[in-house]
């Protein structure tokens, strides 16, 4: 992926650069990238059975941008002056209305994939959309930030990120594990030569580029890096985990694994073997900027905003499936089942409400920009790791063995020796045909019971941070803004209205005339 083929650097000058179509996106992946799977290098991720339908699910999202009915929802005018259009979340938000527009666009795109692509192309707009207003944060690399803001917005490049170090020697600082963590090994006129590894490079096999930063404290300059790297960069390698998409194709059909077979964001180990990062792709090369990235770049509030809207869509989908499921099993009228379905809807409503609150109670930021409300975002980040596992548990409780009282394969339905028995003994309640019951319950099993489903629970539990950090960082955020003082002051106000001698408020009547014990 050579970004220069997509862009015109002149700000405010009309050009022909537009967001990719689905076909253009797929073609952009045919660039010779080094992706390894099952002991072999993948020639073309768009045709390999481990990645091809997941790539086509993303292509479907790009095609949606070009549908006339999406104008004003998924497609709005750019702010670069090129005369093009873009997804609203790739632009600087300057009002609550802008954030609502961004939220609605995130939702519209996620409805194309039923909420199952956590790292969709607009996920990294959480970062890219900050660069226009916050370019000064990157100091000497300010112009790089502005250029990437323009490029990413006009072409809507698909970036992922990898900011976590491999879980090796976690008791040591990153800059004491030079054989593992990403660092500069050489400076050249052309750029920085970088080696090391990053995880978890979710979906990176089918992205145009990756964004690399760091989470945690750094002390040595050579580790203080923030940069982007095209996926076809020489020396950049991806070692992919097993493919749920390919496993689904081998073991079943889309009828058997309707989610695994098309929405698998393959996670990978990303290795840099003396990769050249051109200076124009560098955002920071110092520890102060790298250490301040999470709290000062604007990314934190926005990635939580994207995640909350996405999860709300996912829960819409899951709630609909579960309600249909209990109808098919005949338990929809049971009081206990109704209670638990109500709880799923409570979780669904909470995340929709948090996405509303994040958008409609924005915080002023830099250069006239606004950010989604941080406190509501932090609440989402805590409760996503509680709510999603709970929803999964409810599904297992209310549907029970129905999730596995299923025949093995779609081909069973074509076997005349089997079909009459399946139709009789595997049918649903209320006149639901066996094949329709099995179709729905296999969908739910893929959501919660397969390896794909297990990976999604792990993702929702952890992608926003570990279970301790997401909670204590909420406290730290309150302390940083003085909101903790306001809350303690509220408690102190109550305590100031009385003392050991009685009421201190003049409007309240003392009780000396009623006391049994008198001093």
UniProtKB/Swiss-Prot annotation:
Name of the top EC class for this enzyme: oxidoreductase
Catalytic activity: 4-nitrophenol + NADH + O2 + H(+) = 4-nitrocatechol + NAD(+) + H2O
Induction cue: By 4-NP in the presence of NphR.
Activity regulation field: Partially inhibited by concentrations of FAD above 10 uM and completely inhibited by concentrations above 50 uM.
Cofactor(s), names only, from the UniProt record: FAD
GO biological process annotation, one example: 4-nitrophenol catabolic process
pH dependence text: Optimum pH is 8.
Gene Ontology terms for molecular function: 4-nitrophenol 2-monooxygenase activity; oxidoreductase activity, acting on the CH-CH group of donors
Gene3D superfamilies given in the database record: 4-hydroxybutyryl-coa dehydratase, domain 1, Butyryl-CoA Dehydrogenase, subunit A, domain 2, Butyryl-CoA Dehydrogenase, subunit A, domain 3
Short name of one Pfam family: HpaB_N
Keyword terms of this UniProt record: FAD, Flavoprotein, NAD, Oxidoreductase
Superkingdom, taxonomy of origin: Bacteria
Enzyme Commission number(s) from the entry: 1.14.13.29
Role this protein plays: Utilizes the flavins supplied by NphA2 to catalyze the degradation of 4-nitrophenol (4-NP) via 4-nitrocatechol (4-NC) which is used as the sole carbon, nitrogen, and energy source. Can also degrade phenol and 4-chlorophenol as rapidly as 4-NP.
Record family assignment: Belongs to the FADH(2)-utilizing monooxygenase family.
Quaternary state and interactors: Homotetramer. 4-nitrophenol 2-monooxygenase complex consists of an oxygenase component NphA1 and a flavin reductase component NphA2.
PANTHER family reported for this sequence: 4-HYDROXYPHENYLACETATE 3-MONOOXYGENASE-RELATED (PTHR36117:SF3)
Name by which UniProt lists this protein: 4-nitrophenol 2-monooxygenase, oxygenase component
Source organism (scientific name): Rhodococcus sp
Organism lineage string: Bacteria, Bacillati, Actinomycetota, Actinomycetes, Mycobacteriales
């Amino acid at each position: 992926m050579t970004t220069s083929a997509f862009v015109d650097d002149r700000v405010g000058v009309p050009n022909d650069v537009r967001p990719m179509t689905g076909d253009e996106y797929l073609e952009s992946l045919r660039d010779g990238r080094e992706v390894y799977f099952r002991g072999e290098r993948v020639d073309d991720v768009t045709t390999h059975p481990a990645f091809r339908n997941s790539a086509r699910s993303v292509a479907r999202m790009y095609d949606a941008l070009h549908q006339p009915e999406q104008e004003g929802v998924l497609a709005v005018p750019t702010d670069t002056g090129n005369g093009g259009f873009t997804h609203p979340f790739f632009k600087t938000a300057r009002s609550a209305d802008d954030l609502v527009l961004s939220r609605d666009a995130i939702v519209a795109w996620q409805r194309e994939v039923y909420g199952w692509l956590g790292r969709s192309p607009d996920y990294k707009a959480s970062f890219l959309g900050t660069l226009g207003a916050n370019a000064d944060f990157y100091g000497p690399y300010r112009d790089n930030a502005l250029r990437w803001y323009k490029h990413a917005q006009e072409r809507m490049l698909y970036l992922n990120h990898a900011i976590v170090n491999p879980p090796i020697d976690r008791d040591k600082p990153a800059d004491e594990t030079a054989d593992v963590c990403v660092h500069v090994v050489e400076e050249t006129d052309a750029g920085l030569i970088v080696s090391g590894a990053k995880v978890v490079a979710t979906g990176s096999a089918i992205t145009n580029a990756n964004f690399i930063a760091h989470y945690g404290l750094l002390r040595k300059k050579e580790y203080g890096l923030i940069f982007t790297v095209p996926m076809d960069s020489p020396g950049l390698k991806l070692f992919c985990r097993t493919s749920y998409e390919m496993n689904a194709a081998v073991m079943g059909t889309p009828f058997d694994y309707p989610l695994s077979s098309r929405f698998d964001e393959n996670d990978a180990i990303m290795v840099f073997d003396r990769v050249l990062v051109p200076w124009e792709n560098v955002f920071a090369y110092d520890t102060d900027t790298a250490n301040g990235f999470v709290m000062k770049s604007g990314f934190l509030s926005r990635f939580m905003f994207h995640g909350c809207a996405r999860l709300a869509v996912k829960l819409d989908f899951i709630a609909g499936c579960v309600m249909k499921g209990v109808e098919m099993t005949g338990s929809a009228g049971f009081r206990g089942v109704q209670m638990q379905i109500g709880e799923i809807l409570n979780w669904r409503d909470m995340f929709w409400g948090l996405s509303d609150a994040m958008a409609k109670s924005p915080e002023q930021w830099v250069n006239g920009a606004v950010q989604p409300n941080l406190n509501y975002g932090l609440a989402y980040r805590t409760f996503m790791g509680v709510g999603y596992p709970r929803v999964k548990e409810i599904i297992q409780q209310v549907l029970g063995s129905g999730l596995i009282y299923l025949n093995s394969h779609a081909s069973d339905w074509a076997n005349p020796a089997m079909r009459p028995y399946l139709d009789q003994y595997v049918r649903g309640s209320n006149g639901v045909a066996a094949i329709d019951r099995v179709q729905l319950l296999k969908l739910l099993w893929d959501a919660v019971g397969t390896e794909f489903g297990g990976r999604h629970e792990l993702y929702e539990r952890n992608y926003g941070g570990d279970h301790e950090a997401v909670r204590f960082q909420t406290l730290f955020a309150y302390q940083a803004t003085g909101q903790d003082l306001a809350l303690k002051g509220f408690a102190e106000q109550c305590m100031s209205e009385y003392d050991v001698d009685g009421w201190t408020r003049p409007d309240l009547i003392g009780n000396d005339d009623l006391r049994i014990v008198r001093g």
